[in-house]
From Swiss-Prot:
Cofactor note: Binds 2 magnesium ions per tetramer.
Family: Belongs to the class-II aminoacyl-tRNA synthetase family. Phe-tRNA synthetase alpha subunit type 1 subfamily.
Phosphoprotein recorded as keyword: no
Signal peptide: none
Keywords in alphabetical order: Aminoacyl-tRNA synthetase, ATP-binding, Cytoplasm, Ligase, Magnesium, Metal-binding, Nucleotide-binding, Protein biosynthesis
Annotated Gene Ontology cellular component terms: cytoplasm
InterPro entries: aa-tRNA-synth_II, aa-tRNA-synth_II/BPL/LPL, Phe-tRNA-synth_IIc_asu, Phe-tRNA_ligase_II_N, Phe_tRNA_ligase_alpha1_bac, Phenylalanyl-tRNA_Synthase, tRNA-bd_arm
Gene field: pheS
Positions annotated to bind Mg(2+): E253
Name of the featured protein: Phenylalanine--tRNA ligase alpha subunit
GO molecular function, one term: magnesium ion binding
Keyword Cytoplasm (UniProt): yes
Length: 338
């Protein structure tokens, strides 16, 4: 049995030293040291030895096992390093090669429309202002002629952070913040994200809006009509029929909804315009004196108008998109079309 152990050790040493891959090393380890390996087979014959021989053979068996395990570990380190060196050599990177440019994406259609709206109003003399999306109740409601318990608040389903803080339901709070900081004349648009508790094919809980307002001496409804008619003809094309309908907003008086001739059917009537030939596009009106009172503007000296529009709605009509939710699903097949 001693001779078998010595012979197995020599055979194992040669096998480990000649192995040149991790897979081969593992196969050799199992062959000699596994549960059904050669060492286990030899040790099964221990019962045939005399009591005096067993300790000697057992010690030799343990020595052989230890040496084979050390050979396996040492050769594994060597082979592992060789394989790593080979891999690094094969996967070498030539740092002198010219770099590859990242492929550029495209702007989101909502971003394109916001930029176009901004460009049009900038050419008309408007500057751009921004405000916080988490807004105080005062700026979102009270200063816009909607005090606590005012029935007009029911027109908008609001996300409340707490009793006095909300996710803004429109970008009109920017109008209040701007007028509190600047004396007339002011001519500003405020694009931004707004939030309302509504979700269907034409509404989402988060969408984009552009608020605009102008305050100066002797501003009339005719000025409002001229500005909006010019804007709509530039965004949708010349020759567009526009109409103003009387409406109600708590922060403007008089107020008007602005409709355009349906861009889908050219006024003939279709499913999109509900066979009316017209599409509601934005709300507008002359700024209410109560709003001027909130910002310490003299309504006897100054007058002004305000308007607001949903960017996604304009994008839907401009690009012929029939489902508002497509703008928020991040489908590359859809976005690549713009």
């Amino acid at each position: 049995m001693r001779d078998k152990l010595v012979a197995m050790l020599e055979l194992g040493r040669k096998a480990f030293e000649s192995a040149d891959s991790a897979v081969e090393l593992q196969e050799i380890r199992v062959r000699f040291l596994g549960k059904k390996g050669e060492l286990t087979a030899i040790m099964k014959g221990m019962g045939q030895l005399t009591p005096e021989q067993r300790p000697v053979v057992g010690a030799l068996a343990n020595q052989v096992k230890s040496e084979l395990e050390e050979l396996f570990e040492e050769r594994s380190r060597i082979v592992g390093q060789q394989e790593m060196d080979k891999r690094l050599k094969q996967e070498r990177v030539d740092v002198t090669l010219p770099g590859r440019r990242n492929s550029c994406g495209t702007k989101h259609p909502v971003t394109l429309v916001i930029e176009e709206i901004t460009d049009i109003f900038s050419a008309l003399g408007f500057s751009v202002a921004e405000g916080p999306e988490i807004e105080q109740d005062f700026y979102n409601f009270e200063a816009l002629n909607m005090p606590k318990d005012h029935p007009a608040r029911d027109m908008q389903d609001t996300f409340y952070i707490n009793e006095d803080v909300v996710l803004r339901t429109h970008t009109s709070p920017v109008q209040i913040r701007t007028m509190l900081k600047h004396a007339p004349p002011v001519r500003v648009i405020a694009p931004g994200t707004v939030y309302r508790r509504d979700s269907d094919i034409t509404h989402t809980p988060m969408f984009h809006q552009v608020e605009g307002f102008l305050v100066d001496r002797n501003i009339t409804f005719g000025d409002l009509k001229g500005i909006l008619t010019s804007f709509l003809s530039q965004i949708f094309g010349k020759g567009l029929n526009v109409r103003f309908r009387p409406s109600f907003f708590p922060f403007t008086e008089p107020s008007a909804e602005v409709d355009i001739q349906c861009v889908m059917c050219k006024g003939k009537g279709c499913r999109v315009c509900k066979n009316s030939g017209w599409l509601e596009i934005l709300g507008s009106g002359m700024i209410d004196p109560e709003v001027f009172k909130s910002v310490d503007y003299d309504s006897e000296t100054y007058s002004g108008f305000a308007f607001g529009m949903g960017v996604e709605r304009i994008a839907m009509l401009k690009y012929g998109v029939n489902d508002l939710r497509l703008f928020f699903e991040n489908d590359v097949r859809f976005l690549r079309q713009f």
